[in-house]
Amino acid sequence: MMAAMATARVRMGPRCAQALWRMPWLPVFLSLAAAAAAAAAEQQVPLVLWSSDRDLWAPAADTHEGHITSDLQLSTYLDPALELGPRNVLLFLQDKLSIEDFTAYGGVFGNKQDSAFSNLENALDLAPSSLVLPAVDWYAVSTLTTYLQEKLGASPLHVDLATLRELKLNASLPALLLIRLPYTASSGLMAPREVLTGNDEVIGQVLSTLKSEDVPYTAALTAVRPSRVARDVAVVAGGLGRQLLQKQPVSPVIHPPVSYNDTAPRILFWAQNFSVAYKDQWEDLTPLTFGVQELNLTGSFWNDSFARLSLTYERLFGTTVTFKFILANRLYPVSARHWFTMERLEVHSNGSVAYFNASQVTGPSIYSFHCEYVSSLSKKGSLLVARTQPSPWQMMLQDFQIQAFNVMGEQFSYASDCASFFSPGIWMGLLTSLFMLFIFTYGLHMILSLKTMDRFDDHKGPTISLTQIV
């Protein structure tokens, strides 16, 4: 089944290949093509659907090689299964997955015993109806849970294997079960094959439980974001291959974001640098905040319309200081979408509270918010405005990112950036384009103004003599 997803290779003769590589523009063209292909691959994830009912999808509906399925097209595939199929829907949500994972680790070329997707392949073979979409737009997947909730009229229930065995599912009542696969492809302690095999075992155990209870169902497997099977290689215009004995660059250590959890991850917060000043005395809170297991999140709170992330630090400036990020989620009728806003940032210390307005930290609730600088300093944009001036407190967050609504796992959704449209780089590009357009127009005008001479003197011919008439 997965072998059909592998692409065929085209072989070139040695003479043709040597002739092509003599062309100076070919490496540059291949570099740009590879970069464009890599950028496009990061925007899509696969989606696998199967059901215990028959005739939910047409036999040729899954022939989508090279096509990216949009959210509208995905709804046309899901509507028949949700309206005519079973009312019990399972959504297996993995951290990272790409179509290349099936090619690299699936049971292709008859090697079924080496497949990391044995339970998934068996489920697809035995399912009366199945559908495989190799490339689905990330936006469609990010809104899949909300779409299923609206179509079924049931809230998503986060379950694990133990909880599923205790549930009593009814074929007539709708149920949306969200199963987060416990292994993530970002784990450095496990190989990708072991990660995918562990996820496949969870899928097999869940399906066995439903089969033993004789419960009809429709299942879907997808991921939050794509993964990369091959190791990233820097593509430059000068050449595509690695240099011999090249030393691999050491990647910087990136700490995981701060995550507030109740029954699931609710609020995510990250910054490359988190610094605070009190009476012009600066303290770097980055090593005390990110990657710290004992971070005090007492006072944090979350629901669908309001979120509060509370960070408490002891012995900061000689006392206990608490920073509270207050966010609200509202539905705006004009856009018919939910937007979140960080209403304020509170600093609690010694019984006093300092307030910073942060109304410019806003975006659609399905996205996270990212900004290069969120600071109270004027030279850094002043997105944080103190209510009382002058304030003894100063804040500076570099490469700031936060998400408090529609969080799925320990990873941020795609970010809504604070960068304005008319940035200095865009102004430079516009002015340069206008200047080049002026030069082109002037040159075209000069070319069109050229005139040919219909008469001229022939210096090699006889001279013209004029007789003087008296």
UniProtKB/Swiss-Prot annotation:
Topology Cytoplasmic: residue spans: 441-470
Give TM segment ranges.
Answer: 420-440
Q: What are this entry's molecular-function GO terms?
A: ATPase activator activity; small GTPase binding; transporter activator activity
UniProt PTM:
N-glycosylated.
In which compartments does the protein localize? Endoplasmic reticulum membrane; Endoplasmic reticulum-Golgi intermediate compartment membrane; Cytoplasmic vesicle, Secretory vesicle, Synaptic vesicle membrane; Cytoplasmic vesicle, Clathrin-coated vesicle membrane
* GO CC terms in record: clathrin-coated vesicle membrane; endoplasmic reticulum membrane; endoplasmic reticulum-Golgi intermediate compartment membrane; endosome membrane; extracellular exosome; Golgi membrane; lysosomal membrane; membrane
Q: In which tissues is it expressed?
A: widely expressed, with highest levels in brain and lowest in liver and duodenum.
Q: How does it sit in the membrane?
A: Single-pass type I membrane protein
Tell me which parts of the chain lie in the Lumenal compartment. Answer: 42-419
> What is the top-level taxon of the source organism?
Eukaryota
Q: Name one GO biological process term.
A: intracellular iron ion homeostasis
Which residues are reported to carry the modification Phosphoserine?
465
Propeptide residues, chain positions: 42-231
Kindly indicate where the leader peptide sits in this chain: 1-41
Q: What is its main location?
A: endoplasmic reticulum
Query: What are the entry keywords?
Result: Congenital disorder of glycosylation, Cytoplasmic vesicle, Disease variant, Disulfide bond, Endoplasmic reticulum, Glycoprotein, Hydrogen ion transport, Ion transport, Membrane, Phosphoprotein, Signal, Synapse, Transmembrane, Transmembrane helix, Transport
The positions flagged as glycosylation sites are 170, 261, 273, 296, 303, 350, 357
State the disulfide connectivity: 371-418
- Positions marked as site (Cleavage): 231-232
Query: What InterPro entries does the annotation carry?
Result: Ac45_acc_su, VAS1/VOA1_TM, VAS1_LD
Q: Which disease is it linked to?
A: Immunodeficiency 47: A complex immunodeficiency syndrome characterized by hypogammaglobulinemia, recurrent bacterial infections, defective glycosylation of serum proteins, and liver disease with neonatal jaundice and hepatosplenomegaly. Some patients may also have neurologic features, including seizures, mild intellectual disability, and behavioral abnormalities. Inheritance is X-linked recessive.
> According to its UniProt entry, what is the function of this protein?
Accessory subunit of the proton-transporting vacuolar (V)-ATPase protein pump, which is required for luminal acidification of secretory vesicles. Guides the V-type ATPase into specialized subcellular compartments, such as neuroendocrine regulated secretory vesicles or the ruffled border of the osteoclast, thereby regulating its activity. Involved in membrane trafficking and Ca(2+)-dependent membrane fusion. May play a role in the assembly of the V-type ATPase complex.
Family named by the database record: Belongs to the vacuolar ATPase subunit S1 family.
Q: How does it assemble?
A: Accessory component of the multisubunit proton-transporting vacuolar (V)-ATPase protein pump. Interacts (via N-terminus) with ATP6AP2 (via N-terminus). Interacts with RNASEK. Interacts with TMEM106B (via C-terminus).
Protein name (Swiss-Prot/TrEMBL): V-type proton ATPase subunit S1
Q: What is the lineage of its organism?
A: Eukaryota, Metazoa, Chordata, Craniata, Vertebrata
